[in-house]
């Protein structure tokens, strides 16, 4: 049976069949006496029982080739296994029909649906984008999460990772983003084409690497139950799947996203989890090739390899579509200096930090905004995009939250009696900020306008003269707004209400305070 990932036109080309497997080492097969092997060329291996596996040439040196086998090397007989070189790199058949479908880590459909009729076959390694053709990421993608939208806004075309750790709810956050993510239509826009700003033109590509069966079921069930599966394409590589398959899973997801963005002109959000599993697979292949290890055993080229994934986000001139990446990685031992988050931070444009301390206090989502950063936030917010007070409110929230954390640390040393009235006010803001602004229900979606109004209700704890990060004209316009005025702002915006009904009285109390 021919490999479904390789076009049928390649299968009729006469090929040389080799029976020269020299050895097997982990996920690698060493071939001897082969003619003109090429780097990244796809290889078909036929086992004695007739089953076929596919692999990719990792190293070609003279008449010797090293091949990584995607389905694993167990059961390969060195003397009886036959090998064919296809002459092509790995390609993925893409189509708009892939929306709403679930694939495994090798690109094969696993949802019992009909076969996808490919409209194009694209190289999974992508094509280099001319830097001059790249457009600066602008306009905001809404996640419905206040801590992200208000203080770490994500621009269309940005790449921003989520730094998490074992035992933290990064899977729940990823599922919530997939449920709630959408476009914030830029006000007054007339020259971006009919596609821009339309909700039906927003799609999600979700790639999971090395997840267990329970996590895979959680994502598929969640997407099916809330109705977001219709705009989502899933690639699932499970923990019991071959490790080497994790090398190609994110590339399959990004190839699909590039087709949606640049051919169908959709705005695509790509969520990849868990990049730590991907890097572990990279280390395993490097060890099998007996390469000189780098920091903590990871290969020295891991920075370059990660960049081939992250740099496929962005926008291209002449196309209305965009690719926004949110890769998720788990930091071993909560260590942000580990090579994986360290190198990721050099390539990407910020990070969203999931904090264990907030999680232990029962706050969901436990996003610590102080170490979090969005380097392209300034191009995604402001008048005409979100609201003119957005940037100033964000700066003031950062300042007051940092002061509140300092006051909490001082209270632990000297006690509450030694604190000044201003310190006690900062402690009050700290508690309400974490309990009512950062915290929200897993099925609660807040528009950016609702999040900004909630932020103002918190800032009213302070007198006007204490808000030193906001210009006076902004304070005069937004500080004294009544609750009725604020509630009328986001009526035309769709929201998913769950815990917001219980949060409304608390918001009124904050205004009174």
Swiss-Prot record:
GO terms for cellular component: vacuolar proton-transporting V-type ATPase, V1 domain. GO terms for molecular function: ATP binding; proton-transporting ATPase activity, rotational mechanism. The lineage of its organism: Eukaryota, Fungi, Dikarya, Ascomycota, Pezizomycotina. V-ATPase is a heteromultimeric enzyme composed of a peripheral catalytic V1 complex (components A to H) attached to an integral membrane V0 proton pore complex (components: a, c, c', c'', d, e, f and VOA1). Residues 504-513 have a biased composition (Acidic residues). This is V-type proton ATPase subunit B. Keywords: ATP-binding, Hydrogen ion transport, Ion transport, Membrane, Nucleotide-binding, Transport, Vacuole. Belongs to the ATPase alpha/beta chains family. One of its GO terms (biological process) is vacuolar acidification. Gene3D superfamilies: 3.40.50.12240. Pfam families: ATP-synt_ab (PF00006), ATP-synt_ab_N (PF02874), ATP-synt_VA_C (PF22919). Its main location: membrane. ATP binds at residue 375. The keyword Transport applies.
